[in-house]
């Protein structure tokens, strides 16, 4: 997503000022700090920056200017999921739990998927945000009054539709992902004669996250 964002910024001849290290220093969310640093690295040899020395253009659209904040928040969400999955993989989720050293067993709730379902839902929102902001950058680039480039990025606008359908397909995919971003973990249903009266829907959360990732990859 950062690479696509940097390429889009270059095509727009956008400002590099939003990626100044001082910006995230005063609001140091880890994902934003990492994204800002990555953008500086990706844009290090850019020739576009020179065009802004005496440029009247102060602010680019949010989808370009807020890349560290949006991409970074998504990275933080995915990091949270990663931490939860590592902890889960190294945990006992059986029922009952057997403690041989004490000669004891306990029937409890370590099998419940809520600690994973909620981070999975959080990650789906992150993936949705990546797709949303990428599609908005694409829309800007094909819009001549916004980008200064030929309509739909074709040398023969009007005669050829260029990348018009690419943006239409991306819009459809990000709209689908908004549904996948709806939390599965807020739902529950009773089973087993009301003995299992609260379930996490973690499996569904994982499946819709997988679909959201595939859709977002296509957009980016």
Predicted regions and their residues:
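C-terminal catalytic subdomain
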Residues: 114-219
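Accessory "access/gating" subregions that flank catalytic or transport cores
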Residues: 9-132
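P-loop NTPase catalytic cores that bind/hydrolyze ATP
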Residues: 5
């Amino acid at each position: 997503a950062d690479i696509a964002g940097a390429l889009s910024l270059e095509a727009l001849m956008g400002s590099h000022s939003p990626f100044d290290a001082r910006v995230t220093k005063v609001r140091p969310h880890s994902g934003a700090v990492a994204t800002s640093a990555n953008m500086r690295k990706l844009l290090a040899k850019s020739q576009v920056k020179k065009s802004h020395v005496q440029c009247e253009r102060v602010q680019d659209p949010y989808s370009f200017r807020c890349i560290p904040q949006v991409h970074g928040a998504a990275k933080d969400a995915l990091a949270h999921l990663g931490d939860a999955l590592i902890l889960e993989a190294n945990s006992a989720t059986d029922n009952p739990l057997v403690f041989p050293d004490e000669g004891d067993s306990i029937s409890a709730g370590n099998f419940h998927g809520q600690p994973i379902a909620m981070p999975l839902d959080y990650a789906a929102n992150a993936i949705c945000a990546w797709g949303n902001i990428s599609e908005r950058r694409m829309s800007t680039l094909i819009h001549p009054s916004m980008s200064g480039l030929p309509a739909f990025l074709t040398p023969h606008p009007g005669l050829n539709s260029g990348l018009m359908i690419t943006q239409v397909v991306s819009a459809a995919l990000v709209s689908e992902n908004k549904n996948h971003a709806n939390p599965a973990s807020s739902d529950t249903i009773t089973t087993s004669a009301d003995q299992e009266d609260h379930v996490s829907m973690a499996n569904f959360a994982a499946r819709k996250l997988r679909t959201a990732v595939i859709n977002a990859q296509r957009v980016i």
